């Protein structure tokens, strides 16, 4: 099959090189109706030229494709469904296109396979979702097709491995073709065609948060997390999800964390994208090592200068790998903390709402308890003891700390706590076998809001669990429905801890506590090495 595709595309190529103007013709030559196509479509980097080329194919020649991709990020990723070029979709994340994808799903324009977590989708590339054709993005290539993927390697090795070794075709877009690549990230014998775009591939600055946007309420939740969870369990190995709440934690480490005497005791080893808001903690000596899923726009020079912290190649640039980092997050991290849009009374959380289907990204994987884990650590053992004190210690399984953090009322004053997740309504509307729940309640160990911390590990039954959640739900309808006496008993047992129970005065949650209060401050911390995207520069 591959030989026939190569022969069909041969007239368009000089060796492996295909002109950008012929990219659409190349796809028409190698694709067959109904085939599986994997396009990058990553969390951050995008094979944007190839996405546009695919959206421009003749739908009479190429139609009914089954798209398997990590991220639905660009408009072209959905244009192919509107034009009938693609029919079925299996994916993980769709943040920038969350509203449009919802409309297409509700309108029958997309046949949904499933919404996955990254590692789950990657696994299926090798079992039942193996791509016939992969469209990938790299920085540069040489004449033999050796690729340099640079800091944003991300998903590329996984996609190429699954496709190239199962009779598939790999097509790479590159910024330029060079005589010698700085580093061979993908060997040329796995790449069949190279399209020179003449410009860098698009990268979404997904993990950049302007400290100016951090509120005092978010600072309070960060203080609670640091003192009530990080310090309590001695969390050294961790992952932070996206959001202002976790950005606040990062910016409080050199100030509030220092005041608590926690340097060297917490937050030393990370599975994390290079968050700009972590720069002050790195420069203050908090961080020993970071392995990255991908890079972040503007962080390249800073990473080169801090090869003592980041994983870098001989050329000095970051080597990221989403599959490996997701594995590290699953098995080698003791804590995941992230935000969500909705939490129900069982602790299930989801980012699906009535109008948005953002997908999950890595959260279901990072926020799950790895039952195959066998190595002990202090936080893991302590959490396991809180969950199950009766089992003998030598036989007691530890627990990963999975923390959901947020304000009781979120964007547009929408309550974070709900009786029923919108994900259930979506499942009913689309006749799905499984509701798209991001983190299941039995994996969630703590819920943090401005009202305090609910420790779900210590709940003895479903009623206690429900009221622990109600107890930190504030003035939402869920919070107002609490049994005050039961909530107070839970507080007496330490299941619920208010700020004052931890010696935290809410009035101390002041923006002056942040180690950086603007993007410009982050640039200063980096000694000018961090080059923020233009949208974040106001000076």
Outline where the language-model segments fall:
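Conserved alpha/beta enzyme-core scaffold
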Residues: 1-539
């Amino acid at each position: 099959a591959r030989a026939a595709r190569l022969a069909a595309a041969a007239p368009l190529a000089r060796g492996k090189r295909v002109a950008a103007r012929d990219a659409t013709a190349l796809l028409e030559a190698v694709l067959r109706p109904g085939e599986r196509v994997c396009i990058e479509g990553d969390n951050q980097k995008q094979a944007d030229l190839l996405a546009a080329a695919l959206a421009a194919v003749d739908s009479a020649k190429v139609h009914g494709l089954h798209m398997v991709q990590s991220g639905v990020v660009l408009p072209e990723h959905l244009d192919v469904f509107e034009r009938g070029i693609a029919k079925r979709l299996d994916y993980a994340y769709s943040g920038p296109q969350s509203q449009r994808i919802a409309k297409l799903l509700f309108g029958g324009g997309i046949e949904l396979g499933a919404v996955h977590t990254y590692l789950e989708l990657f696994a299926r590339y090798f079992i039942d979702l193996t791509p016939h054709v992969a469209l990938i993005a790299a920085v540069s290539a040489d004449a033999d097709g050796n690729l340099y993927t640079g800091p944003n390697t991300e998903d590329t090795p996984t996609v190429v491995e699954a496709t190239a070794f199962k009779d598939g075709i790999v097509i790479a877009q590159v910024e330029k073709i060079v005589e010698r690549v700085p580093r061979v990230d993908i060997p040329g014998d796995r790449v069949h065609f190279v399209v020179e775009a003449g410009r860098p591939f698009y990268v979404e600055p997904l993990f950049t948060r302007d400290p100016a946007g951090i509120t005092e309420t978010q600072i309070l939740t960060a203080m609670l997390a640091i003192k009530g969870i990080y310090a309590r369990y001695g969390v050294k190995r961790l992952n932070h999800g996206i959001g202002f709440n976790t950005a606040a934690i990062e910016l409080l480490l050199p100030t509030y964390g220092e005041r608590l005497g926690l340097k060297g005791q917490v937050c030393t080893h990370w599975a994390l994208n290079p968050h700009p808001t972590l720069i002050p903690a790195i420069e203050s000596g908090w961080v020993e090592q970071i392995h990255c899923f991908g890079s972040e726009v503007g962080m390249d020079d800073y990473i080169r200068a801090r090869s003592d912290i980041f994983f870098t190649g001989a050329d000095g640039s970051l080597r990221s790998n989403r599959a490996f980092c997701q594995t590290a997050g699953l098995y080698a991290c003791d804590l995941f903390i992230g935000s969500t849009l909705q939490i129900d009374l069982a602790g299930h959380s989801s980012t699906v709402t009535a109008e948005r289907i953002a997908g999950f990204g890595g959260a279901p994987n990072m926020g799950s308890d790895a039952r195959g884990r066998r190595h002990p650590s202090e936080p893991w053992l302590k959490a396991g003891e809180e969950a199950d004190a009766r089992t003998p210690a030598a036989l007691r399984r530890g627990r990963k700390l999975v923390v959901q953090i947020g304000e009781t009322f979120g964007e547009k004053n929408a309550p974070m706590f709900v009786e029923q997740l919108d994900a259930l309504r979506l499942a009913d509307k689309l006749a799905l076998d499984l509701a798209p729940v991001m983190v299941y309640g039995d994996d969630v160990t703590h819920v943090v809001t401005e009202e305090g911390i609910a420790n779900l590990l210590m709940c003895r039954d479903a009623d206690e669990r429900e009221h622990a959640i109600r107890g930190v739900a504030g003035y939402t309808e869920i919070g107002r429905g609490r049994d005050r006496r039961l909530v107070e008993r839970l507080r007496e047992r330490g299941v619920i801890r208010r700020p004052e129970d931890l010696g935290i005065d809410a009035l101390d949650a002041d923006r002056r506590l942040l180690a950086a209060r603007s993007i410009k401050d982050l640039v200063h911390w980096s000694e000018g090495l961090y080059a923020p995207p233009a949208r974040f520069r106001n000076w």
